[in-house]
Amino acid sequence: MQNVDNTAVIDAANALPGRLTSIPVSPLHAVHGHSMTYIPEGMDLAFFAMGCFWGAERLFWQQPGVYSTAAGYSGGHTPNPTYHEVCSGRTGHAEVVRVVFDPAVISYQQLLQIFWENHDPAQGMRQGGDVGTQYRSAIYVLTPEQEEQAHKSRERFQQAMEKAGDQRVITSEITVALPFYYAEDDHQQYLHKNPHGYCGLGGIGVCLPPNV
């Protein structure tokens, strides 16, 4: 098998071919009981990568105004990858949380605040002890408005880090969302099904300044 550099995202030419069939998942969210795929009228969609998706998904499903969440893969090349394939570093995907939310209750700006304040966005291709391109920090945007807000929030958080004495450069990528592929069902709402399971999520003690 070809050796893979786990500090660089693989290119499309060398990525695994994947498959045409999608990974089956439960139709209903194990916590909220809502559809895992349907987006009701008036709801919005967002995608965030914060390292291992187990803890990140729980963080978002706990927020008032979040209708449903899902763990999955995005940002890479391989269609309908398996968890094992993503962990091999040969798909280009990050572990991503899909968030369906009610903007009348929780804004995209508030979701960005949750994103920045609850992981380390300056670690490159890792998050704590989890090492590999699948653990990179990312915001995958769906609209020009989301893109603008994401970039501005990154600038504010970078300034806040510097003010706090952290001179590292944020490595979080902000790009237009590519196709999202659902992870296997045992990864969905993992920390609800396994309350004492692994969670490597943790912030750096810096708050996102308000958007003024």
Curated annotation (Swiss-Prot):
Catalytic residues identified in the record? 52
Asked if the keyword Oxidoreductase belongs to this entry, the reply reads: yes
GO function term, MF aspect, one: L-methionine-(S)-S-oxide reductase activity
Q: Which reaction does it catalyse?
A: L-methionyl-[protein] + [thioredoxin]-disulfide + H2O = L-methionyl-(S)-S-oxide-[protein] + [thioredoxin]-dithiol; [thioredoxin]-disulfide + L-methionine + H2O = L-methionine (S)-S-oxide + [thioredoxin]-dithiol
An example GO BP is: protein modification process
The protein's matches in Pfam families, at most eight in alphabetical order, are given as:
PMSR
Task: Give the highest taxon in the source lineage.
Answer: Bacteria
Q: Where are the transmembrane segments?
A: none
Q: Which GO terms describe its cellular component?
A: cytoplasm
Recorded hits in InterPro entries, A to Z, give:
Met_Sox_Rdtase_MsrA_dom, Met_Sox_Rdtase_MsrA_sf, MsrA_MetSO_reductase
The record's keywords, sorted A to Z, are: Oxidoreductase
What EC identifiers does the entry list? Answer: 1.8.4.11
Work out whether the entry's keyword set contains Oxidoreductase.
yes
Top-rank EC class of the record's enzyme: oxidoreductase
- Please report which protein family the annotation says this sequence is part of: Belongs to the MsrA Met sulfoxide reductase family.
Entry-linked NCBIfam families: msrA (TIGR00401)
Xref: PANTHER family: MITOCHONDRIAL PEPTIDE METHIONINE SULFOXIDE REDUCTASE (PTHR42799:SF2)
Q: State its role.
A: Has an important function as a repair enzyme for proteins that have been inactivated by oxidation. Catalyzes the reversible oxidation-reduction of methionine sulfoxide in proteins to methionine.
Q: What is this protein called?
A: Peptide methionine sulfoxide reductase MsrA
